[in-house]
């Protein structure tokens, strides 16, 4: 729920990455969520240093959304622990440091664009009009402030949801399929903005099932059937799988049933932190 500056020149990658020894911004320890006999999230471990973009990559139904809901404290875990900025989740007090763009449009259809944005921003004490207008400029809705959300196209509603998720300048940002329904040109602007946020120290966790966006992430977590199959930078994952194609790499890890294996990968660091 949120805001930031309008797009600047394209950024190819986050600037200087913080060291892997930085205190994790997001942690999961043996995190599990069951729905009856189904293990939607099955023993996930991760420790994500700040200032990077992490991609949760997997097919629909792989557990990405459930994992995000556990990390944000919006769902209760069957077992295990989740922490954001060192605080055990769920934590009402910690929500002000978190931005969350849901997979479905988390806005009120009867309210206007401006009313939606100011409502969500006010929940976190953000009332600066100039800042909020910059949010709408970023998503190209600044000329539609009075339009009821119900009259927006699906892509416009997604853009409004993003503006609401970023309006309070959160330190940790969870984006669940943020570019679905967004035109290609605006999608590039979004990713440029994500990289600027990470360069300024924010931590972004972005879920997607679209492989062609994966190379824009600093690190990936391949997820299937509630398990983290592998973690690492896109080039590292391709090299380990012996392919130039990330989709092929994902399928090979899924077929082999591999677990996160590279030294220093997010999931591995979580296990180290518990020893």
Which residues make up each language-model segment?
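ABC ATPase "signature
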Residues: 231-232
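Conserved ABC ATPase "signature" region
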Residues: 118, 122, 129-144
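Conserved ABC transporter NBD signature motif
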Residues: 80-96
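Helix-to-loop junction immediately C-terminal to a conserved catalytic motif
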Residues: 72
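Catalytic Walker B motif of ABC-type/P-loop ATPase nucleotide-binding domains
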Residues: 173-177
């Amino acid at each position: 729920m949120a805001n930031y500056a309008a797009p600047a020149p394209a950024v190819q990658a986050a600037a200087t990455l913080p060291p892997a020894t930085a205190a994790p911004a997001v942690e999961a320890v043996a995190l599990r969520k069951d729905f009856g006999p189904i293990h939607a999230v099955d023993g996930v471990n991760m420790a994500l240093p700040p200032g990077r973009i992490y991609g949760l990559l997997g097919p629909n139904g792989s557990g990405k959304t459930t994992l995000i809901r556990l990390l944000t404290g919006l769902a209760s875990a069957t077992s295990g622990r989740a922490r954001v900025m060192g605080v055990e989740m769920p934590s009402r007090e910690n929500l002000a440091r978190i931005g969350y763009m849901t997979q479905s449009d988390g806005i009120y259809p009867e309210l206007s664009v401006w009313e939606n944005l100011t409502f969500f921003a006010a929940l976190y004490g953000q009332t600066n009009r100039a800042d909020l207008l910059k949010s709408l400029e970023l998503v190209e809705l600044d000329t539609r402030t009075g339009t009821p959300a119900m009259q927006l196209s699906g892509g416009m509603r997604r853009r409004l949801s993003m503006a609401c998720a970023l309006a309070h300048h959160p330190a940790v940002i969870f984006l669940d399929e943020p570019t679905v329904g967004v035109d290609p040109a605006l999608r590039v602007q979004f990713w440029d903005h994500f990289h600027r946020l990470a360069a300024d120290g924010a931590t972004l966790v972005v879920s997607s099932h679209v492989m062609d966006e994966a190379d824009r992430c600093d690190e990936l977590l391949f997820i299937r059937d509630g398990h983290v199959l592998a973690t690492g930078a896109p080039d590292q994952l391709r090299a380990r799988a012996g392919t130039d194609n990330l989709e092929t790499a994902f399928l090979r890890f899924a077929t082999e049933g591999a677990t996160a294996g590279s030294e220093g990968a997010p999931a591995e660091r979580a296990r180290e932190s518990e020893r």
